[in-house]
Amino acid sequence: MPRRQTTVDTHVHIWEMPPIAPIGPSAPNFTSKPKAHGNAELQLADMVANQVDKTVLVQTSFSTWDNEYVAASAIKYPDRFVSMGLVDPLDDKNAEQAVYWMDEREMQGFRFHPQYYSEVDILKRPENDAMFRQIEKRAGIVQIHNRPEHAHQLDYVAAKYPGITWLIDHMMYPEPNMAPDWDAYKPVLALAKHDNVLMKISDIHNRSESDEHPFSDMHDVIKMAMDAFGTNRVMWGTGYPGYHRVEHGWLSLADELKLVREGFGWLSSAEQDKYLGGNAMRIWNWNRE
């Protein structure tokens, strides 16, 4: 029997509730709060049920700047998880925080949200240079959550810090109304010129104007992104653990996998394997036991 390719979900938010872990905003005007936990064990059960081997855990925006629960979960289950945290881009001491989470709590990088800060280009902020230098020194990973109008910020830092691996979350949100020319999305595709920038092709159904699998109105832009970045620099990701997926408007994990395996018919078997896990196995350090 041929060996099954390792499947890696590169984007799942987990969280706990007080008193186990704090809940609260980590960005201006962010008021969302969960009603129940979405913990590591819920994600593990979902993975087992759907034959997903590994997951990149990402700190949520409603879990404060304290990354401890996410970091501890990855340390507890090193064969299953790695972790990505948050640090405050407006805190002038954030370099110290980045060093702590990477050196002491095994986090492999951080997520930033330029779209949450309308008054400042947070990635280009001079005060963040020390932080990015420390992340770069550790060959860290930074994932960027924003929209096409913020692509210029990633263009700047990807060139300035070539030792960081930069990830575009959720394709940077292309919308079907950008078709047929997709001019509004071209600044995102242009980021492929940086060899250290990769893209998570995820959250597809929430961008689609269709309610039906396989959300075909998104296929042209997915193909454009895969052509621009190449199948060695695209990765699969989802969103929330367990029942929280459907409850929060995401597809179930089974349907997320079905979308790729049945809906992305243009991918060869080898390309699908790279997208669903091979590339992620190369980007993160999974040898931590």
Where are these regions (language model features)?
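Short beta->alpha connector loops
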Residues: S61-T64, V87-D92, Q115-Y116, N146-A151, ...
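Short, acidic/polar
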Residues: A36-D46, D91-M102, D183-A184
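Catalytic pocket-lining loop regions of alpha/beta-barrel enzymes
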Residues: D121-W236, H244, R282, R288
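Divalent metal-dependent hydrolysis catalytic cores, especially in the metallo-beta-lactamase
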Residues: A27-F62, R80-D88, Q108-Q115, V142
